[in-house]
């Protein structure tokens, strides 16, 4: 039996190709880490089924984006993959999952950053708000779509985020305190 998230992935990524492989491998790593962190923190009462589903779908919008290095040959700028995914999931009747899509980029994107950097996004805050949104965004920072077999350390994740500004680093460091150092869910290489 197919899971709900798998049916959505199959609808938008019907062919067994490199992009589908990248999406599923990356998303599974994010989901596994998010679930491992959530299970260590039962006092947070996180919705584990939702965490898994939303983590598996958080990057669904990459198919619409132009990022040839990861086999994405759409027309939208990559920075918009969260918004594109949110649009797709809202059309699927998944508004809660859509919020994860549109709020996971970087450590969230502020209205101010969109305005000052002239990003091709609506002028509003796209910051993770719920604990589940924050957890999935946090877990995502430890994996890239170009090195699928590697899990970043906290220091490596911070270095990746640093180029986008101090406010994202502040949010990320707060998540390190809230959710803890991540366990290795992939063998370090």
Language model features: what each stretch is:
Residues 1-14, 80-103, 181-189:
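Short N-terminal secondary-structure initiator segments
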Residues 28, 32, 95, 177-180:
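Generic structural signal for well-ordered, non-transmembrane alpha-helical segments
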Residues 17, 21-24, 129, 163-166:
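Charge-dense, low-complexity intrinsically disordered segments
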């Amino acid at each position: 039996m197919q899971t709900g998230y798998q049916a959505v992935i199959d609808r938008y990524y019907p062919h067994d190709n490199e992009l589908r492989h990248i999406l599923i491998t990356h998303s599974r790593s994010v989901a596994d880490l998010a679930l491992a962190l959530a299970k260590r923190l039962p006092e947070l009462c996180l919705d584990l089924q939702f965490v898994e589903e939303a983590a598996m779908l958080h990057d669904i919008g990459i198919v619409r984006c132009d990022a040839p290095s990861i086999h994405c040959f759409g027309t939208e700028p990559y920075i918009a993959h969260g918004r594109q995914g949110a649009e797709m999931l809202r059309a699927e009747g998944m508004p809660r999952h859509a919020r994860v899509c549109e709020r996971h980029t970087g450590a969230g994107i502020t209205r101010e950053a969109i305005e000052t950097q002239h990003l091709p996004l609506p002028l509003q805050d796209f910051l993770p708000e719920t604990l589940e949104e924050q957890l999935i965004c946090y877990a995502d920072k430890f994996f890239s779509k170009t090195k699928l077999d590697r899990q970043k350390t906290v220091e490596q994740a911070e270095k990746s985020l640093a180029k986008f500004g101090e406010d994202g680093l502040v949010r990320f460091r707060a998540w390190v305190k809230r959710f803890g150092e991540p366990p290795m869910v992939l063998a370090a290489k």
